[in-house]
């Protein structure tokens, strides 16, 4: 069995297996890859690779539309979203669609529209994917040079990179437009317990926006995950969108510098590995963001964060015992520290007990009770409102944790309450996907570097152990 030398010259990786499933131009004889190697067979067939990518986009959008409609069909307005296992409707709610004061759902029709639009879009993408995979030209270079490319063409590759950056920038600005002009977005910090509002006073100060990037990721600093007002989030999208668009234009107009030509591997598999690394980083950041941040991911829709549930429990029992006559300012706990209140390392008054580790928490239901030096004792005695008690009791019993024993002092009740927080799902899934994308990055980067160095040849199939074994049948 012979692999075409002309193809091998540009792609030095041979992975030879039996070529029983023959597809003209996509079989093992002509590509050096068996059917299960998927898109590797299309490395030099830009038209077919386009079909694969468009079809893949169709599958993604189909899932979004179908899952969206599934959630709408099962949605019960009387229960909070996070009690219903929803992962898509909370995103739409955060964007301000169908939501009234306090995060209450007043209209599910926008969610239905979103699902239908995604389904229709997926049909268009699916048709395009099938067309380009089966009927369209195998390669685009001859008939549509603008869409054609050769992997080694560094200038063309950076032009494609530039186009992608511009599209990402446009996406960032879509959120800005929604927040500024098209109905606004949901602000969990709005007075009176959260509401949809238009963002009027954008934060555009570079020292504030880029200050987040310079913060420590630990403790009370929290890097970009610590952002806690929408002005900063939307202003950050203005900066990000602008940088992406200007960077995209720059990459389209310029050619790679000499140091970049030398430092990077310029092959399809190398670009795949770079992309996987970038997506992996995005996954890990998203994991931390959805776990800790209750501004971009409002607790009204996603359920409380872990620290928030723990602090809510301390607050709930402080309220109860204060009513029973306890002096919460001076009561001593079993460790000799304050039972209800204590001081943080920097002197602020914070909740005592196991939840002391979460003293950094900021949440809309708790901030009104703070003074210049942390929790204000007189406010805790006189100013606690019924809505704060209700919300903290609700959050206390809906921690994003499932455990047989106490976790940070939170009542998890995993055997009594059939509840898994969307925060748990979204954090865990993004961590796991981020990890596997990172492994994929290492794999493809190693193969791409080996191919560039010219020493990867795959396994020698002539002396493979399985060939000397008795057939299974």
UniProtKB/Swiss-Prot annotation:
Parts of the chain that traverse the membrane: 69-93, 134-155, 178-200, 255-275, 291-312, 447-471
Note on how the cofactor is bound: Binds multiple chlorophylls and provides some of the ligands for the Ca-4Mn-5O cluster of the oxygen-evolving complex. It may also provide a ligand for a Cl- that is required for oxygen evolution. PSII binds additional chlorophylls, carotenoids and specific lipids.
Modified residues (Phosphothreonine): 15
Keyword terms of this UniProt record: Acetylation, Chlorophyll, Chloroplast, Chromophore, Manganese, Membrane, Metal-binding, Phosphoprotein, Photosynthesis, Photosystem II, Plastid, Thylakoid, Transmembrane, Transmembrane helix
Localization per record: Plastid, Chloroplast thylakoid membrane
Main location: plastid
Superkingdom to which the source organism belongs: Eukaryota
Residues engaged in binding [CaMn4O5] cluster: 367
SUPFAM superfamilies: Photosystem II antenna protein-like
Keyword hit for Kinase: no
UniProt-listed InterPro entries: PS_antenna-like, PS_II_antenna-like_sf, PSII_PsbC, PSII_PsbC_sf
Modified residues (N-acetylthreonine): 15
Biological process, per Gene Ontology: photosynthetic electron transport in photosystem II
Molecular function GO terms recorded: chlorophyll binding; electron transporter, transferring electrons within the cyclic electron transport pathway of photosynthesis activity; metal ion binding
Gene3D superfamilies: photosystem ii from thermosynechococcus elongatus
Topology term for the membrane: Multi-pass membrane protein
Keyword NADP among record annotations: no
Gene Ontology cellular component list: chloroplast thylakoid membrane; photosystem II
Residues making up the propeptide: 1-14
Pfam families found in the cross-reference section: PSII (PF00421)
Subunit-level organization: PSII is composed of 1 copy each of membrane proteins PsbA, PsbB, PsbC, PsbD, PsbE, PsbF, PsbH, PsbI, PsbJ, PsbK, PsbL, PsbM, PsbT, PsbX, PsbY, PsbZ, Psb30/Ycf12, at least 3 peripheral proteins of the oxygen-evolving complex and a large number of cofactors. It forms dimeric complexes.
NCBIfam families, alphabetized: psbC
Record family assignment: Belongs to the PsbB/PsbC family. PsbC subfamily.
Stated role: One of the components of the core complex of photosystem II (PSII). It binds chlorophyll and helps catalyze the primary light-induced photochemical processes of PSII. PSII is a light-driven water:plastoquinone oxidoreductase, using light energy to abstract electrons from H(2)O, generating O(2) and a proton gradient subsequently used for ATP formation.
Protein name: Photosystem II CP43 reaction center protein
Organism listed in the record: Aethionema grandiflorum
Gene name linked to the record: psbC
């Amino acid at each position: 069995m012979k692999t075409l030398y002309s193809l091998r010259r540009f792609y030095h990786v041979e992975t030879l297996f039996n070529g029983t499933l023959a597809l003209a131009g996509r079989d093992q004889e002509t590509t050096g890859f068996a059917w299960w190697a998927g898109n590797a067979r299309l490395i030099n067939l830009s038209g077919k690779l386009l079909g694969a990518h468009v079809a893949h986009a169709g599958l993604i959008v189909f899932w979004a539309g179908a899952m969206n409609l599934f959630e709408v069909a099962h949605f019960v307005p009387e229960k909070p979203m996070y009690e219903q296992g929803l992962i898509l409707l909370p995103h739409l709610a955060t964007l301000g669609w169908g939501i009234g004061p306090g995060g209450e759902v007043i209209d599910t029709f926008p969610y239905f529209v979103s699902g239908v639009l995604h389904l229709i879009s997926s049909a268009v993408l699916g048709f395009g994917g099938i067309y380009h995979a089966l009927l369209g030209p195998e390669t685009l270079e001859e008939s549509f040079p603008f869409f054609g490319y050769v992997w080694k063409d560094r200038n063309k590759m950076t032009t494609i990179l530039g186009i992608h950056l511009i599209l990402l920038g446009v996406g960032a600005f879509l959120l800005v437009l929604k927040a500024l002009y098209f109905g606004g977005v949901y602000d969990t910090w709005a007075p009176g317990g959260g509401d949809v509002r238009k963002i009027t006073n954008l934060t555009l100060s570079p020292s504030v926006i880029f200050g987040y990037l310079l913060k420590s990721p630990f403790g009370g600093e929290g890097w970009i995950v610590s952002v806690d007002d929408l002005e900063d989030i939307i202003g950050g999208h203005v900066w990000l969108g602008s940088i992406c668009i200007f960077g995209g234009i720059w990459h389209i107009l310029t050619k790679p510098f000499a140091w970049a030509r030398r430092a990077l591997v310029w092959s399809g598999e190398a670009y795949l590995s770079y992309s996987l690394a970038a997506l992996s980083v995005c996954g890990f950041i998203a994991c931390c963001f959805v776990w800790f941040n209750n501004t971009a991911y409002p607790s009204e829709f996603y359920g409380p964060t872990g620290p928030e549930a723990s602090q809510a429990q301390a607050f709930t029992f402080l309220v109860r015992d204060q009513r029973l006559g306890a002096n919460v300012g001076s009561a001593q706990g079993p460790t000799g520290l304050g039972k209800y209140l204590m001081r943080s390392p920097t002197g602020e008054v914070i909740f005592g007990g196991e939840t002391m580790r979460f003293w950094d928490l900021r949440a809309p239901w708790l901030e009104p009770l703070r003074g210049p030096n942390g929790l204000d004792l007189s406010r805790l005695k006189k100013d606690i409102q019924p809505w704060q008690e209700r919300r903290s009791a609700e959050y206390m019993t809906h921690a994003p944790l499932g455990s047989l024993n106490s976790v940070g002092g939170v009542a998890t009740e995993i055997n009594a309450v059939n509840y898994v927080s969307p925060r748990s799902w979204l954090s865990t899934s993004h961590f796991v996907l981020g990890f596997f994308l990172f492994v994929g990055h290492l794999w493809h980067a190693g193969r791409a570097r080996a191919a560039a160095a010219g020493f990867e040849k795959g396994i020698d199939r002539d002396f493979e152990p399985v060939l000397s074994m008795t057939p299974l049948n």
